[in-house]
Amino acid sequence: LRYAEQIFQLGEQLPLAVREAASSQGVRLSVGISDGLPKPVARHLLLPATDTEGLHLLCSEGEFDDLLADLALHRLDVVLADRPAPVNPNLKVYSHALGEAALMWYASPALRALSDAAFPACLDQMPLLLPSRHAAVRARIDDWFDRKSLRPRVAGEFEDSALLATFGESGLGAFPATEWSHDELTGQRGLQLLGRCDEVVEHFYAISAERRVQHPLVQKVLGQ
């Protein structure tokens, strides 16, 4: 009798569960975000898809190579990264350039007060926080230091751009960020702009498992 009552209760609950599932259905977009990609950049790149009614956005962050493997296995709809996918005949993925953004340098007010030199010479007079060497932009930053004859003191290197900005806000060092992060850094975090570096830009890519993308939200991200 107890089992019969449980079956009856389940039968009553089933229509409600079906209705709830139906109401929660939406347009799903599963995105892999390379761990070298700054969070404000990821938000900016996904913005064209976020006005979709019923959007169900799934974002996962991970190592670039791991995300490409998941993409090839169709566990992800798209990967956002700061570099194109490497040429590999065994990996059927396709890179789409989304744009680029110049780097800008920031520091806490207290740190900025330590130097009255103009940008970029002021970078030689304060500790710096940099993206790790896993980030595609790091080599371009190092080359720029050489061209400008800068010999800065590196106080920290970070995989996570959000963590880098947090330590920068605390005054540990000056740091670079894309121009798309400017409002957040100067407004919410109260950092000061040291200067703009148009000679170093970050490039951004969407990587898909299809040459001709069929997913409507990935098409929006690509501007199609």
Model segments located where?
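Flexible hinge/capping segments at coil-to-helix
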Residues: A22-S23, K92-R133
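Short beta-strand->loop
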Residues: V93-M104, G187-V201
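A late-sequence structural motif
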Residues: A113-L114, Q192-Q224
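Short, well-ordered beta-strand segments
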Residues: R28-G32, V79, L129, F175, ...
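Central regulatory/effector-binding core of bacterial HTH transcription factors
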Residues: G26-V87, F158
